[in-house]
Each structure stands twice: as structure tokens, then as C-alpha cells.
Amino acid sequence: MSLLTEVETYVLSIVPSGPLKAEIAQRLEDVFAGKNTDLEALMEWLKTRPILSPLTKGILGFVFTLTVPSERGLQRRRFVQNALNGNGDPNNMDRAVKLYRKLKREITFHGAKEIALSYSAGALASCMGLIYNRMGAVTTEAAFGLICATCEQIADSQHRSHRQMVTTTNPLIRHENRMVLASTTAKAMEQMAGSSEQAAEAMEVASQARQMVQAMRAIGTHPSSSTGLKNDLLENLQAYQKRMGVQMQRFK
């Protein structure tokens, strides 16, 4: 796996699923391929994206700044600086300085990542802030190692939280989660269907599913009534794709 592929993988792992994630993935691909060279426009676009947490925006801004060639005097962006200040905690800053001194001696991506993984996410963010604000300089490979270690820590905590929700025995939470997933799947079906005549059937199925979820929420239904709703939708989507000549494995 190439270095940039690895960086893209780690960074995208902390971005919530949805149309915005696909958009960010495309931007990262363009940046890594040298197709997008307007850092100012890229940062302005990132700043105004909804849904993303300030830290995720800060990490993406740091990645773009490291990768896109720019004039030396280009102003640093406040939204990135604020996100990478370790919540203003002096302990984070102390640890970040210690980590920075170690990274300065490290020139490889994997070496930097291994060193960084033993620090907290707050210290890692502060260390990125030091480098972003030009208070310290490390090799690009070491900076990417720092970024990937931070993303791994964030993704780990997100995974634990997600696993807790998926394995919860609370029927109301499970019911709502199934309805949210069904609604999201229906929306994706509508986007994938496009405007061809054959798409009408898939659009109809998706529309009915969304109406059903709305009705279930409006009148309040038994927690078991949503079981299998998303899977039914995915089976419909696969049947539609088969008719269109597209063979895809199950999303489940």
C-alpha cells in the first residue's frame, strides 16, 4: 500500500458516512494526484462543510496544507489552528512538545506513527498544531505518520461507541437505529437510481420505504416492526442493479 493510500484510508475512517464523505474522498484523491493546486479555495471549501467536527476539519486542513504546493507567505487558517490546540490544555501542549522532539529525529512514516500511538489524541492534535503553525518542522512522512496515529485513536473510540450502540439490548434504540439505516439506504437508492426509465421502480421502492419510516415514527410502532427493513431495501437495490447489468456484492 502506498503512503498516500494509507493516509487517505486513515483520514476517511474518521469522516461520517454520507454524500459528504464521497466528496471529501474525491478531494483527497485529486490533491494526492496533484490535480487540485488551489489551497486557498480548498481550505475555504473545507471550512464551510457541515457535519464535520472541528477536529476532523483541522486534520483535513493539515493534510491539504502538507500536500498542496503553496506560496510560503500563505496565511494559516484560524479554524485549523483552533482545532489543533489540544483544547487549550497545557498538559497536552507539554506532551506535544516532547512528541515533537522525538518526531524531529524520525524520518519514516511508520516510525513516526509507532511513536505517536503512545500519546493521547489531545497531545497528538497539539503536536499537529505546532507543525501547522510553523513552530516546528518535521519530514512530510513523519507528519503523515502523526496524522494517521491521530486518526487511528479517533477511529478506535468511534468504533467502541458504535459497537456499544449496535450491541445495546435497549429495544427502542435498536428500533430507531434500524429505521435510520433504512431511511439512509432509501436515500442512497434514490441517488444511485438516476433518471433512466428503469430507475422508476427503484425510486418507487425507496420512496415507499421512506414514507413507511415516517409513518412508523409518527404513530409509534412496536420496536420489532423495523426488523429486516434495511435488508429488504438492499435486496431490492441489488435486484435493480442486476437488471441494469451491474453485479455488486452485498452491502450487508
UniProtKB/Swiss-Prot annotation:
- Per UniProt, what is the membrane topology? Peripheral membrane protein
Query: Which biological processes are named by the entry's GO terms?
Result: viral budding from plasma membrane
Xref: Pfam families: Flu_M1, Flu_M1_C
In the record, what terms sit under GO molecular function?
Answer: RNA binding; structural constituent of virion
- Where is the protein localized? Virion membrane; Host nucleus
The UniProt keyword set, sorted, is: Host nucleus, Membrane, RNA-binding, Viral matrix protein, Virion
Highest rank taxon of the organism: Viruses
Locus of motif Nuclear localization signal: 101-105
Q: Where is this region: Membrane-binding?
A: 1-164
Provide the Gene Ontology terms for cellular component: host cell nucleus; membrane; virion membrane
Which SMART domains does the entry mention?
Flu_M1_C
Q: Where does the protein principally reside?
A: virion
* InterPro entries, sorted: Flu_matrix_M1, Flu_matrix_M1_C, Flu_matrix_M1_N, Flu_matrix_M1_N_sub1, Flu_matrix_M1_N_sub2, INFV_M1
Q: Which SUPFAM superfamilies match?
A: Influenza virus matrix protein M1
Family, similarity comment: Belongs to the influenza viruses Matrix protein M1 family.
Subunit info here reads: Homodimer and homomultimer. Interacts with NEP. Binds ribonucleocapsid by both interacting with genomic RNA and NP protein. May interact with HA and NA. Cannot bind NP without genomic RNA.
What is the recorded function of this protein according to its Swiss-Prot or TrEMBL entry? Plays critical roles in virus replication, from virus entry and uncoating to assembly and budding of the virus particle. M1 binding to ribonucleocapsids (RNPs) in nucleus seems to inhibit viral transcription. Interaction of viral NEP with M1-RNP is thought to promote nuclear export of the complex, which is targeted to the virion assembly site at the apical plasma membrane in polarized epithelial cells. Interactions with NA and HA may bring M1, a non-raft-associated protein, into lipid rafts. Forms a continuous shell on the inner side of the lipid bilayer in virion, where it binds the RNP.
Its protein name is Matrix protein 1
User: Can you name the source organism?
Assistant: Influenza A virus (strain A/Brazil/11/1978 H1N1)
Designated gene of the protein = M
